[in-house]
Curated annotation (Swiss-Prot):
GO aspect biological process, one term: cytoplasmic translational termination
Gene (UniProt): frr
Keywords assigned by UniProt, alphabetized: Cytoplasm, Protein biosynthesis
InterPro entries: Ribosome_recyc_fac (IPR002661), Ribosome_recyc_fac_dom (IPR023584), RRF_sf (IPR036191)
Protein name: Ribosome-recycling factor
A Gene Ontology cellular-component term: cytosol
Pfam families (UniProt xref): RRF
Length: 185
């Protein structure tokens, strides 16, 4: 029973860290990376699909992303989708290649983005702690119903706390890496 609670808690904590990683990837730094366009969708044959499914997304240099649609007639739609995404990007079509230059971040904008990133990280940590609380509540309920002993309950809570510490440390590492990325010029 305790093992099931631990496995469930670990899965939820892992998911919280994955969501944090996805949310941090959405925050634009001054450096180009192909993952920046993962959330951008374009209409293709009546349905919305990610840009990466209708175009080849590559890095042209450290500050420019190249997007080459598989079909030439998609270039205008892809360019419009990138421009309309709220990433603050200004793509320019050069033949069948769409160049997406990364604008420089001002010091003020960097500080604002760091605040956003710290908020995202705190949400991730809170999510992890909520999973811990739920797991501990479940363990306490089992103890109250006399399905487990006090020793098993204590060991279970200690194991859940170790998982919590592990995943909060992982979230903090993601935050530190993103902050360093934002402050790098």
């Amino acid at each position: 029973m305790i093992n099931d609670i631990q496995k469930t808690a670990e899965g939820k904590m892992q998911r919280s860290v994955e969501v944090l990683k996805e949310n941090l990837a959405k925050v634009r730094t001054g450096r180009a990376h192909t993952g920046l366009l993962d959330q951008v969708e374009v209409e293709y044959w009546g349905s919305m699909v990610p840009v990466s499914q209708v175009a080849n997304v590559t890095l042209l240099d450290a500050r420019t992303i190249g997007v080459k649609p598989f079909e030439g007639n998609m270039a205008a739609k892809v360019e419009k989708a990138i421009r309309d995404s709220n990433l603050g990007l200004n793509p320019a079509a050069v033949g069948d290649l769409i160049r997406v230059p990364m604008p420089m971040l001002t010091e003020e904008r960097r500080k604002d983005l760091i605040k956003v990133v710290r908020g995202e990280a705190e949400e991730g940590r809170v999510s992890i702690r909520n999973v811990r609380r739920d797991a501990n509540d479940h363990i306490k309920k089992l103890l109250k119903d006399k399905e487990i002993s006090e020793d098993e309950a204590r060991r279970g809570e200690e194991a859940v706390q170790k998982l919590t510490d592990k995943y909060i440390t992982e979230a903090d590492k993601l935050l530190t890496a993103k902050e360093e990325d934002l402050m790098a010029i």
